[in-house]
């Protein structure tokens, strides 16, 4: 199955990528995607270290959410500031 991963803010700036198509095996979870992305390069590992807010098809979800073919996964860095 294929999913589209979208990145925003600091994650996009660090990786230099905004949309990525990933081929995954059936029953893959968001945690699987994050692990695969971290293994891609040091930039991805840095961008996804710590907590990441995730949304699947524009709904907030947790790391154990199973993905389906055609899903859109958005990865947001934690909100910071003061």
What residue ranges belong to the model's regions?
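Ubiquitin-like/PB1-type beta-grasp interaction modules and other compact soluble beta-rich domains
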Residues: 1-80
């Amino acid at each position: 199955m294929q999913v589209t991963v979208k990145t925003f803010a600091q994650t996009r700036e660090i990786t230099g990528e905004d949309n990525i198509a990933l081929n995954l095996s059936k029953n893959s979870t968001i945690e699987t995607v994050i692990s695969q992305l971290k293994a891609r390069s040091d930039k991805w590992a840095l961008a996804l270290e710590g907590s990441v807010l995730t949304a699947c098809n524009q709904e907030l979800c947790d790391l154990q959410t199973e993905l389906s073919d055609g899903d859109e996964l958005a990865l947001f860095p934690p909100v910071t500031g003061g």
